[in-house]
Structures are given as C-alpha cells and as structure tokens.
C-alpha cells in the first residue's frame, strides 16, 4: 500500500492511494478459502471445490467485496495515523476507465484511488477560570404577584347573559357567527359559528373587536378589518376583508374578587396559597430568562476566545438550514427583505456569520464535552421523550414509537441536553457575578437570546 498526500488546503486534505495487486489477491484468496466450505457447486463435494474454480465463479464479486473492505480499512488507518477528526464523510474517487476497472477486478492491476476529506481543526481550549459573566437577578415584588393574580382572575372570570335588548360594551364577551370575504370572495378559514370574542382582548385581527361595541343579540353587522402584514397565513397578510357578523349572545364579565373563595375554585386553600404559587411561578420564569442571559453571555465569551477556521462544508450546511428557515418564515408571513430594512445579499452575509459562529461553538462544546467525559445518559433522554409525550395528550404511545424508530430525532433531543450540561460544567469554573436588575431590563432584547448558539 502506498499513500501520498496531494492536497493540503486549509482544513481540506486529499490522498492518492495505491493498493497493491498482491495485497488484493492475497485477501481475495483468503476470502475464497473461507467460502469453499460453505458453497455448494454441482460436481464437487462440500469443501473440495478447487480455488481456481471458485475464483472463476466468484472472483469478481469477492474482489469487489474485498476492495470495499480494504478501502474502508485503509482510509481509517490514514485518518487515525494522522490524528484526523473528520468534519465530513470521505469522498472517494475510483478509476472510471473500463480497462483499468476490468484489470483491477480481474486481479491483474493495482487499485489507484483518491480520498478527500475536510478535518476538524485542533482546538486550544481557554482556561474556563478566566471567564467572567454576569447573572441578572430579579426579585419577585408584591406588585408582580398582584399583576399575576389579576391575569389569573381575568383568565378564569365568569360571564353573565346581559339579557334581551342589551348591547355589547368593551370587556363584554360576544358570541358571534361570521362569514369572511376578500373582494367579495370567501376565503379558507374565514367563516365560523359560535365563536366567543372578548372585546378588547386583542385576540382577533385589529379592528374586529372594536366594531362589536354596541351590537345586540340577533343583530348582523358587516365588519371591515385588515389582516396584519405579518399574519401567519401569507395569502391573507395585508389583505382587507369583510366579515358578515351576527351576535348570538352578549355577556358581561362577573365581578370576580381575588379572595379565598376564588382560590378554592382553582384547587388552592386560600388566596395566600394562590399568591405563593404565583410568586413561585414568576420566580421560575425569571430564573429561566436569567439562565438564557447567562448562557448567551458565556457563549459570547467562548466565541471570542476560540476564533479558528471552521470546516467550510459544515458552515455551508448550517447556513443552508438557516436560510431555508428564514425564507420559509418570510414566505409564511408575507414579509420581504425590503420590509425588514435589508437586502438579500446583506441578509445572507449576516446569516453566514451566524452559521460560522454556530459551527465553531458546536465544535468547542463538543471538544469540552469529550475532554471532560460529559455525556447524556439514557435516563436523561427518556425524560426528554416523556416531556414531549406529555405535550401531546392521547398520542403518548405514538411519540414513544417515533423516537424508538428514529435515531435522528433522538440525536436532536440529546443535543440541547448535552449543550446545557457542558454550559453547567463551565459555569462551575467560571466567575459568575449576580447583578440585580429590573424585570424590564431582564426581558430587554429577549428575542436576541433565543438563538444563543
């Protein structure tokens, strides 16, 4: 066997490999010798088939099998001896000329092929003890709890029929049936019956609810409203529509005091217990947002400390996935690059930077996990699957079966668990300073942290 490195370009490597005909032949003979006790050929007793006859009958297929094994083992040796960590699957280029291929399969010539790969660069990890991050901390105030209780009351308040002839006011709940059209033509999803609408809740498209003020039971109105430009259904985004709307019930909100009796309707002993639960839920919510802030800050520090060339193929794959997502979202919302105050070229440049960052951070986190033996346990994966199953009541068995049969989906569950475990490991060594902030400061620019890696 001969190996010659022919390309060294950044992280790209290519090798010219020659497998000697003698090495190929000896392995073919060994494989045929294994087969002679297993094959059954007319005219020969078991185990007595001459090697020459076996070679005439099975030589080409066995040679192909041996070559596949030799190429795989040779490539593995090339990469292992050089300490390569592969970023991509090896790309193998075999002979294409018919005579050369025939000579190799006939056992009359060496096999010459090339193998090209892209490798992961050697990563020098920063000393995690030199990393400092701030942890924003929000104290749950009494006013926060009071606001939460108000929201709970609003979400659980009852309504009373206002009676015959009464008209709807802001805050009332009106049950309506409507038929929507655009330019006189009905559209999919534009008609419904028996839909409760709380005037002022903002759950319907802008302008719809306000035009219900003053409506009475049995009254029909033509409500004109325009779908937002970022509406989820692209075909409707920005379109002006008319809804022939009939009210079938008008109800006023009940006066629902936040007291012990109200708390009991929610299964709690008292208002104090409800406040305690609300405080705990807010504390958990703030802690979750704070965690994302800390994680983002830590990833920023890791990004700054590990500036290296990322494998171009991985960056391109990440960019393509990102770009498909962006284009799909823009299509569904009807937005354009112009409406987002950018251009396609500028957006692509920005998302290529994001893709490069994600790939580098992924490699860094993987390196940290490997060097510190951080692993995701089967129990952790099972808990993640259980959580997914709980989110789909009635389809739990289907969810379990899906993950049992889909290794790629399990890998997608493992990835964020692994990332969080590595982050926790680093934070144990880094300097984390708590910084008291307001609720508004905690949530400021929250969208920027949703793609932390």
Swiss-Prot record:
UniProt KW keywords: Cell cycle, Cell division, Chaperone, Cytoplasm, Isomerase, Rotamase
Main EC class the enzyme belongs to: isomerase
PPIase FKBP-type domain sequence ranges: 171-256
Signal peptide extent: none
InterPro entries in the record: PPIase_dom_sf, PPIase_FKBP_dom, Trig_fac, Trigger_fac_C, Trigger_fac_C_sf, Trigger_fac_ribosome-bd_bac, Trigger_fac_ribosome-bd_sf, Trigger_fact/SurA_dom_sf
GO biological process terms, semicolon-separated: 'de novo' cotranslational protein folding; cell division; chaperone-mediated protein folding; protein transport; protein unfolding
Catalytic activity annotation: [protein]-peptidylproline (omega=180) = [protein]-peptidylproline (omega=0)
GO cellular component: cytoplasm
GO molecular function: peptidyl-prolyl cis-trans isomerase activity; protein folding chaperone; ribosome binding
Pfam name, any one: FKBP_C
Its biological purpose: Involved in protein export. Acts as a chaperone by maintaining the newly synthesized protein in an open conformation. Functions as a peptidyl-prolyl cis-trans isomerase.
Family classification: Belongs to the FKBP-type PPIase family. Tig subfamily.
Compartmental location: Cytoplasm
Domain of life: Bacteria
NCBIfam families listed in its UniProt record: tig
Domain notes: Consists of 3 domains; the N-terminus binds the ribosome, the middle domain has PPIase activity, while the C-terminus has intrinsic chaperone activity on its own.
Gene name tied to this protein: tig
Annotated protein name in UniProt: Trigger factor
Source organism of the structure: Rhodopseudomonas palustris (strain BisA53)
EC number per UniProt: 5.2.1.8
